[in-house]
Amino acid sequence: MFTLLLSNYYSRLEGWMMDNNFSHHWKGMFPTETESTVFCLFVYLFIFVFETASGFVAQTGVHWCNLGSLQPLPPGFKRFSCLSLPSSLDYRHAPPCLANFYIFSGDRVSPCWPDWS
């Protein structure tokens, strides 16, 4: 149905362009009826295969990990995460060692300190 509507649209558009002498400007810009049919068939098959394959994953028993019910680690293993923060730091205050930043301009170098003007 969609292919029929699309091919009808293109044939009417090409007919309008021929009547208005636009054919020499737009020659080869619009796909032929065969090209549009092949394209629609390709899109349909791609969607069909994608939907079918995604159903197979659920049927084979592949499950997502449930992070809320992690098993305890075996002895000798330590839990590690790149996002975990050390528990000894107090995050309500600034760290004890401030980082040194410098602003370089054409005439001078000025360090960026919180109380420096």
From Swiss-Prot:
**Transmembrane spans:** 38-58
Which keywords does this chain's UniProt record carry?
Membrane, Transmembrane, Transmembrane helix
Q: Where does it reside? A: Membrane
Q: Does the keyword Membrane apply?
A: yes
Q: What membrane topology does the UniProt entry give? A: Single-pass membrane protein
Q: The organism sits in which domain of life?
A: Eukaryota
Transmembrane found in the keyword field: yes
Mind naming one GO cellular-component term on file for this protein? membrane
Chief location of this protein within or outside the cell: membrane
Q: Which PANTHER family match?
A: HIGH MOBILITY GROUP AT-HOOK 2, PROTEIN GVQW1-RELATED
UniProt name for this protein: Putative uncharacterized protein encoded by LINC00596
Q: Which gene encodes it?
A: LINC00596
